[in-house]
């Protein structure tokens, strides 16, 4: 009986982690916007992009700009 409670508790923890979506999707190959920006040669900035760079996208779920 104690084993079944332990398995149920583990399942609940696993499902609660999957409910957030971010970590679960990243683990399945969906990359975050920060990763895509840096991988393409950009940098994530909360302030305005420096001179001679353009906004190429967003970072941190749209809270910052990807400058390249």
Swiss-Prot record:
GO biological process, one term: innate immune response in mucosa
Protein name per its UniProtKB record: Beta-defensin 1
Family membership: Belongs to the beta-defensin family.
Cross-referenced Pfam families: Defensin_beta
Keyword match Chaperone: no
GO MF term set: CCR6 chemokine receptor binding; identical protein binding
PANTHER family linked: BETA-DEFENSIN 1, BETA-DEFENSIN-RELATED
Disulfide bond positions: 37-66, 44-59, 49-67
Compartments (UniProt record): Secreted; Membrane
Originating gene: DEFB1
